Amino acid sequence: MSTLTRSNVVGVIAGVVRWIGLLCALVLVVHVLLTVGDANPDNGITRFFSTAADPLALAFKSLFTPDNAHLRVLVNYGLAALFWLIVSAVLSRLIRRLA
């Protein structure tokens, strides 16, 4: 019978934080790919990722305003994806270190 140690619990929590950040970044990247690739906006998959990506983009959604809509999505949502990756990595390390 294995016992659940504090270090195991902390490791799981840190891993969950990391995976959440990765999933947020993945949603944003898929939205960028669908937008830049001119996916049909009426398609259910495209609508799902567009709807899911908007709140994840936070303030990055309108950070840069180039005239080209594809470039705007690529830069702003791409920066938001990087943000989620960095924040989740930092939080994961902090959780492991402080616990």
Which sequence ranges carry the predicted segments?
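N-terminal signal-anchor transmembrane alpha helix
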Residues: 17-38
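Alpha-helical membrane-inserting segments
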Residues: 29-33, 60-61, 87, 91, ...
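Hydrophobic, lipid-facing residues on alpha-helical transmembrane segments of integral membrane proteins
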Residues: 52, 78-90
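N-terminal intrinsically disordered, cationic/polar leader segments
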Residues: 2, 7-20, 85
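Hydrophobic alpha-helical segments of integral membrane proteins
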Residues: 16, 45-63, 67
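Short, charged juxtamembrane terminal tails flanking transmembrane helices
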Residues: 1-6, 95-99
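Membrane-interface elements of multi-pass transporters and channels
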Residues: 36-41, 67, 94-98
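Individual transmembrane alpha-helix segments
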Residues: 66-82
